[in-house]
């Protein structure tokens, strides 16, 4: 092969190579995984089959509460919102800024806000069966939809504060959320695999709890585990953390109610 032909051949290969590169997608592969992906097949089966998922007991109670008149106003959720299937997409947007509360709130807090202002009833306590049941029933309506935290200025500020908390070392063990759920994700701890901490399945039935619990309950449990003083339920710091976790998991599919070890 003479020199001129060699140059032409190499040039043709170079052009072909550049064309191939230009056709390849430039998107980075999404390495995020739901906690579901780290579970045993037996626990996964519990979550996937509604006839076996124990959280459905709470969801069924929540659907009943949806239609029950409550408080001095004798109003039900259905009186204002219609059928519960109209809640599709709602859970995927929380936490979000509430003009009534003048702060960022989670779904459970929104339920209690409606209960007080619309039903003229007493707010349900955190982790109460009625609150968790209704929250679970509403969350189910968003199954399969991507988490979609809204771009509200107040919410963005909350998630920034939450990111700071996520990276902050706390407790006698001097650990941060990031240390476990990013640096050590997929490693083993106490017989279980450390997940990436994406809140796609809350409210969740935890086998450890033998019941359904909120994301705030899980966050408080983590704080206790690293020997730190947990924030009280409803604290702005917990909501800020929830806001950051939702942003971190944006686009991942809602799978409520989850089942976890």
Walk through the language-model features, giving the residues of each.
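Post-cleavage N-terminal segment of exported redox proteins
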Residues: 2-59, 95-160, 186, 208-230, ...
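N-terminal, post-signal-peptide region of Sec/Tat-exported proteins
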Residues: 50-81
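Conserved short C-terminal alpha-helix that flanks the catalytic cleft of nucleotide-sugar-dependent
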Residues: 66, 165-166
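Short coil/turn linking the two alpha-helices of tandem helical-hairpin repeats
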Residues: 69-70, 169-171
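The canonical Cys-X-X-Cys-His
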Residues: 73-84, 134, 162, 172-184, ...
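Short Cys/His-rich "knuckle" micro-motifs
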Residues: 86-90, 187-191
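Short cysteine/histidine-rich metal-coordination sites, predominantly Zn2+-binding motifs
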Residues: 92-101, 193-202
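C-terminal cap of thioredoxin/glutaredoxin-like
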Residues: 164, 171, 179-187, 198-207, ...
């Amino acid at each position: 092969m003479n020199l001129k032909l060699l140059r032409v051949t190499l040039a043709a290969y170079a052009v072909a190579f550049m064309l191939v590169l230009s056709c390849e997608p430039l998107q980075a592969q999404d390495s995020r995984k739901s906690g579901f992906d780290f579970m045993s097949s037996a626990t996964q089966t519990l979550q996937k089959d509604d006839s076996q998922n124990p959280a459905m007991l709470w969801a069924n109670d929540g659907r009943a509460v949806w239609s029950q008149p409550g408080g001095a106003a004798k109003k039900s959720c259905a009186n204002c919102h219609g059928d519960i299937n109209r809640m599709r997409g709602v859970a995927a947007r929380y936490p979000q800024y509430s003009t009534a509360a003048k702060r960022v709130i989670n779904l459970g807090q929104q339920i209690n806000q409606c209960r007080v202002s619309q039903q003229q009833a007493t707010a349900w306590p955190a982790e109460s069966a009625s609150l968790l049941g209704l929250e679970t029933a509403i969350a189910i309506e968003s199954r399969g939809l991507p988490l979609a935290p809204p771009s509200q200025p107040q919410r963005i500020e909350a998630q920034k504060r939450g990111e700071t908390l996520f990276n902050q070392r706390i407790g006698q063990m001097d650990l941060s959320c990031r240390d476990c759920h990013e640096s050590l994700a997929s490693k083993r701890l106490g017989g279980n695999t450390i997940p990436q901490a994406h809140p796609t399945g809350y409210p969740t039935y935890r086998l450890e709890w033998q019941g359904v619990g909120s994301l705030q309950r899980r966050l408080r449990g983590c704080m206790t585990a690293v020997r730190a003083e947990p924030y009280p339920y409803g604290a702005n710091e917990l909501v800020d953390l929830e806001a950051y976790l939702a942003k971190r998991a944006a686009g991942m599919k809602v799978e409520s109610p989850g089942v976890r070890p």
